[in-house]
A protein has these predicted regions:
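Cyclic nucleotide-binding regulatory domains
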Residues: 31, 56-119
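Cyclic-nucleotide recognition modules
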Residues: 39, 91-153, 157
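A residue-level structural signature of the nucleotidyltransferase/glycosyltransferase Rossmann-like core
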Residues: 68, 90, 122-123, 193, ...
């Protein structure tokens, strides 16, 4: 298990979520970053590796929590499913992140579903064992609290944007987020290297795939973007977002 844990520890992780704050539009240090070798070894001792193919569930909404899953490879999508069947994507999480909050010690029902968006490898850490480690090591406890605080800020920002921003503003904000975190400058363009479908973007902003397709086509006609997704004029997307 050590190689996978080492990769998660050494990587700079980032998620994808709906946010407009510059404090959230940045790579996120992995859960294990900053921990001593001894604390990393303690976490390795309680962990069990799990491999998932694309589309396989980590858990379903309503399942009883049993612990957290540290992502070693791949991409995990967390989403809420309404009784109507409509889904709202909360975030995509990458290596170095964990999924399984907010009840990380495993005593309540999961509030949303998490699924592998691509082939992924995770390390499962049982809640009771994780609680014991948090009581024994203040550094581990603080690392868990910091990660939970970041997730809380992400979900709070998402709720604020869904409630106060138009769907067009949310799309523009998401494109700005992707450009800041996953964009690579090539000449006068910013090329977003992460592959996301129109459906992925729609789920993140609370819209439909058809609407996103129409809006991206319009932005392309206006010379703001070029598929896939190359941002030509970042300032235009930011107009009116203050």
């Amino acid at each position: 298990m050590e190689p996978a844990m080492h990769r998660a520890n050494s990587a700079i992780a980032a998620g994808v979520m709906l946010a407009e704050s510059d404090n959230l539009v940045r790579p996120l240090p992995g859960l294990l970053d900053g921990l001593s070798r001894a604390d990393c070894n303690r976490l390795r001792a309680i962990g069990r590796e799990k491999a998932l193919e694309a589309g396989q569930l980590v858990w379903s909404q309503g399942d009883t929590q049993a612990g957290i899953y540290l992502i070693s490879e791949g991409r995990i999508r967390s989403y809420y499913a309404a009784p109507s069947g409509r889904e709202v994507t909360l975030a995509y999480w990458f290596p170095g992140n964990f999924v399984g909050g907010p009840d990380i010690f495993g005593t309540g029902p999961h509030m949303w579903t998490s699924v592998a968006a691509e082939r992924s490898r995770l390390t499962f850490m049982p809640g009771p064992a994780l609680r014991r480690l948090a009581l024994e090591s203040p550094t581990i406890a603080v690392a868990l609290l910091d990660a939970l605080a970041f997730k809380a800020r992400c979900y709070s920002a998402m709720a604020q944007m869904l409630g106060t921003r138009s769907v067009t503003e949310r799309l523009h904000s998401l494109l700005i987020f992707l450009s800041h975190v996953y964009g690579v400058k090539r000449g006068g363009e910013i090329v977003v290297g992460m592959p996301f479908t129109h459906g992925d973007l729609a789920n993140l902003i609370g819209s439909t795939r058809q609407w996103v397709t129409v809006q991206l086509a319009r932005l392309q006609e206006e010379g703001v973007i070029r598929y896939v997704i190359s941002i030509l004029d970042l300032s235009t997307l930011g107009q009116g977002m203050e």
